Amino acid sequence: ILFSADGFGKFGALEAEEEWTDEARRYFINIVGKYGVQVQGLLKKAAGLDIQMICPLHGPILKENLGFYIEKYLKWSSYEPEEDGILVACASIHGNTKAAAEKMTEILKEQGANAVFMDLTRDDMAEAVANAFRYGKVILAAASYDGGIFPPMEDFLHRLAHKNFQKRTVGLIENGSWAPCAARGMK
């Protein structure tokens, strides 16, 4: 039995019959994600053990198909994209940047891309961070604001940096009239 503390945990109710991956990904990235190197080291040590059950502090006890869960943790802790796709993350003040980002998402989908739009002013920030790690590409769309970046995007970027965001292709959409500066800040 592996008592894994925060490892292999997930958000959600214990009694709920729900798919494990989405809430476990969000949990990993937002709770454990900064420690990918350490997780990789522990997974290597655990590889030689005969583990029949994983008991995390948060989430269900895992008893079957343990290889599936371990494979997810190997992927997440390596900071490699989990799947091919594009997150379009937007922070719009009056809706114009949002309209441009939604149009970009629509065009990407028309071209066959797996594109997901998230409005950083309204959507769950932890889910947006998890999606940034999930997909191999991210498009950041933000308005310039007081000589910098509109704060919801600034918060999103701070969270990504704090969780060691890496190994992704990033595109920028900047909106500004007389003093555009969001792209400079997003770099």
Where are the regions a protein language model picked out?
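Short gly/ser/thr-rich secondary-structure transition/capping motifs
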Residues: 71, 118-123
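Short, highly selective alpha-helical patches that border small-molecule cofactor pockets
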Residues: 97-101, 105, 153, 183
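Metallo-beta-lactamase
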Residues: 1-64
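Short helix-loop-beta junction
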Residues: 101-116
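Conserved beta-strand elements of the Class I
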Residues: 2, 85-89, 171
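Cofactor-binding loop segments of dinucleotide-utilizing enzymes, especially the Rossmann-like FAD-
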Residues: 6, 89-93, 120, 174-176
